[in-house]
């Protein structure tokens, strides 16, 4: 006769049935859960942060990158994205965009932009609108607060900084300190129409806010009153010059088309140079080509996209990136400028821009479309290329969103 089970024996055996990983943890015949939630399979994976460029698979689990290697079985994942013949990168990081009710973070996300910084649309007086967009966005959105308290809205012909009463350091600092989770730095536009003769004072005031807090100044250059070397002298390591390939006056080239020595010196001491494509006075083929031929490639590429720019000279971030294939940069160089380098430019993004194991699972998949493609600069000069990046799939925090 079998021995009678005591209550203690019964409780112990019942507990064993509930232990994870035991043979009885799932009903007989039920298939095991897949090892990975999602697999991006068979694409050319370009991860500049890891110096990785090869055909491989990207496996995702729990919203994080779990493995990057060739030959991962499709049966090991719940969902598979077939990326054969396509380019797989970390999610794009666009550090200069202008959001509003029309150009939403969701619109940018559909083009592969999984993180973005609004470049000064909002100042201290209307920062709540930008904060709302950042709070409600699925992708990661941070703000570069305009030193001009009304941002790009409401001042009309006065401009953000033409009247320094609009550049109140105390007011801007309070807005930054109240929203440190979402404000990544200060934006200043230094062109004559926005700052006039106040451009140098604007840099000084912006630095008064950012330097004690370890934040970034992004300065829009081109067509300024003051010479660029005087502006650069006031910028600190980690600060960003945007519109690096803006035409004269007061761009990065001298009258003979040679790179100013002060520009190289600024880079050597840690100032970053960003593209900021935009629509007017920010990027010309001539300046970009001359600078790149002299070895002065951008540190980061950004779109400076606005709602009107979606149909005029900018179009979307992948189109901006594709222009630099035409200008002679390699695809890995371009991807670096829009992922790892862009993420490192702003502390709020430094865990992004990579497919390293454990990183947030933000992934973009592109078709590198071959054929005649027309690209246009800010002067509406058309050049023809042969390759264009076209979004094919986007993964945000491990979930496919395109």
Located regions from the model:
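N-terminal secretory signal peptides and thylakoid transit peptides that target proteins
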Residues: 2-17
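Di-metal (Zn2+ and/or Mg2+/Mn2+) metal-binding site signature of metallo-dependent hydrolases
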Residues: 86-107
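Histidine-rich, glycine-flanked metal-binding segment
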Residues: 26-28, 32-39, 45-90
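Divalent-metal coordination cores built from histidine and acidic residues
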Residues: 107-190
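Divalent metal-coordination and catalytic microenvironments
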Residues: 43, 63, 85, 112, ...
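His/Asp/Glu-enriched, well-ordered alpha-helical/loop segment
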Residues: 286-368
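C-terminal cap of metal-dependent C-N hydrolases
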Residues: 43, 360-402
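Active-site core of metal-dependent hydrolases
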Residues: 188-291, 295-311
